[in-house]
Amino acid sequence: MKRLILITLLATISLATAGAVEPKTFCRFVPERSDDFAWENDKIAFRAYGPALSASAENSGIDCWLKRVDCPIINKWYKENAEGKSYHKDHGEGYDPYKVGASRGCGGVALWLDGKMVISNVFREWKVVKSSKEESAFVLTYYWKHDRDSYKEDKKISIKLGDRLFKTESTFWKNDNIAIGLPIAVGVLRHKKSNKLSKNLDKGWVSVWEKLDGSELGTGVLMDPSRIEKHELYVTGKKLEDHTLLITKTDKNGQVQFYAGYGWKKAGGINTAAEWEVYLNGFRHQTDSN
């Protein structure tokens, strides 16, 4: 009898192990949900808005999906949402409470012209470059016009396993030519005036720490400090329009590079604003050494 119980127990463990989903990075276009493009690793998840939402309030901002499991959730959440189980409610794995609207969200960009953000609409084109356990990468292409000038952005995003930040390498064109020295704003949204704003320009980052549904969330962007022109607290007083921004310029190749991401208290690992700032400081050192 004991032997039978042992065999049954071992078989159960074996099946559970075989069915376990390993942590990995992942990205894909999601035509079944208004042309989203979503990406994730074992700690963080995001989405950008695509062509089907070109007439909506959303544009080129980045939305945070707050996850608290290390297995992939993108396909599961979209499938369950289509079946009536909303990803805007936490069912044990996390959820999407982060409001973006027409803002930059977490790591969106804008042209910085005459002291104002000039933003693009949703992406029009997409291409997966890489999708593996350790790293996923893709390109989103944006087009827009301003004052008779036409602009294009090829936004290459990559995400590595274990990181709380994803990397963006954006290349800009103006009137079909590589845009050198183009002023660009990169930042994160401040949802409320009570949110804690922090910055360390010597380390190259700005962040927001906020209370959210009984927990807390830190968001931030980070870039090479030598590429920062200035910090800008962009305040209009209107809903979803206040941002903390890093102002930079495109380099000789028309490019801007930076990192963006979050730490969610409910997921563990980052529990305070101070811990989030320590992480951002440490991440800068990692990128300096690469």
What kind of region is each of these model predictions?
Residues 173, 190-249:
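Accessory, usually C-terminal, subdomains that scaffold auxiliary metal cofactors
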